[in-house]
């Protein structure tokens, strides 16, 4: 069986580093190939709290590659940049058309709204709740929400749960559960 793969899209500036790193790390522990793509190239991205992350590739170079999941980290202004990007729109449209999963955490669900990605139910950082509700989404305060092929989560403090849910969906509950003890997580 082929290894599952995840694409994490980094905004040019302002992605939430915990959501990028924790999500990617947990997925890698779950034996999922993780590709970090820079929206504005493969140069280091300055995240919301000042950390710099070096993408593996430019998003445009993997735009047509198939991934099991495309993940949008939150943070500001990173989430707004994702919401305004035509390239992100095209990647999400392709992911929906191919039946792949999409994950968005923190404020990143606003990119789902702006790019017309449908979901029955979402969650997010409280700062964008009203915008999502006004955009027609049914909203939940749950820490992680799975609605069809869309996985959303609330913010940095829910990044482990978000990532474990993705591992569960791609590799099964046993694989996800097996990762908890070695990371000393208390969920």
From Swiss-Prot:
Active site feature:
19, 106, 125
Cross-referenced InterPro entries:
Class_I_gatase-like, DJ-1, DJ-1/PfpI, Prot/Nucl_acid_deglycase
Alphabetized GO MF terms: glyoxalase III activity
What reaction gets catalysed by this protein?
A: methylglyoxal + H2O = (R)-lactate + H(+)
Q: Which CDD domains match?
A: GATase1_DJ-1 (cd03135)
A Gene Ontology term for the protein's cellular component: nucleus
Enzyme Commission code = 4.2.1.130
Pfam families named among the record's database cross-references: DJ-1_PfpI
Question: Which compartments does it reside in?
Answer: Cytoplasm; Nucleus
Q: Which UniProt keywords apply?
A: Cytoplasm, Lyase, Nucleus
A GO BP entry is:
response to toxic substance
Q: Which domain of life is it from?
A: Eukaryota
Q: What class of enzyme is it?
A: lyase
Q: Does the record carry Lyase as a key word?
A: yes
- What tissues express this gene product? Expressed exclusively in the intestine.
Q: Which family does it belong to?
A: Belongs to the peptidase C56 family.
Function, as annotated, reads: Catalyzes the conversion of methylglyoxal (MG) or glyoxal (GO) to D-lactate or glycolic acid respectively in a single glutathione (GSH)-independent step. May play a role in detoxifying endogenously produced glyoxals. Involved in protection against glyoxal-induced cell death.
Task: State the PANTHER family in the record.
Answer: PARKINSON DISEASE PROTEIN 7 HOMOLOG (PTHR48094:SF12), PROTEIN/NUCLEIC ACID DEGLYCASE DJ-1-RELATED (PTHR48094)
Query: What name has this protein been given in UniProt?
Result: Glutathione-independent glyoxalase DJR-1.1
Q: What is the lineage of its organism?
A: Eukaryota, Metazoa, Ecdysozoa, Nematoda, Chromadorea
């Amino acid at each position: 069986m082929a290894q599952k793969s995840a694409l994490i899209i980094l905004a040019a500036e302002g992605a939430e580093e915990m959501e990028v790193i924790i999500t990617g790390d947990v997925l890698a522990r779950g034996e999922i190939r993780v590709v970090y793509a820079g929206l504005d190239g493969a140069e280091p991205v300055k995240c919301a709290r000042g950390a710099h992350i070096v993408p593996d590739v430019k998003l445009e170079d993997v735009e047509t590659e198939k991934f099991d999941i495309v993940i949008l980290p939150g943070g500001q202004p990173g989430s707004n940049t994702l919401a305004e990007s035509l390239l992100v729109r095209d990647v999400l449209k392709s992911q929906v058309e191919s039946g792949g999963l999409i994950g968005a955490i923190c404020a990143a669900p606003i990119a789902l709204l702006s790019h017309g990605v449908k979901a029955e139910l979402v969650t997010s950082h409280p700062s964008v709740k009203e915008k999502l509700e006004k955009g027609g989404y049914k909203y939940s305060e749950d820490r992680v929400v799975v609605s069809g092929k869309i996985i959303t989560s609330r913010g940095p403090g829910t990044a482990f749960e978000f990532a474990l849910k993705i591992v569960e969906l791609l590799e099964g509950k046993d694989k996800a559960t097996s990762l908890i003890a070695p990371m000393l997580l208390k969920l």
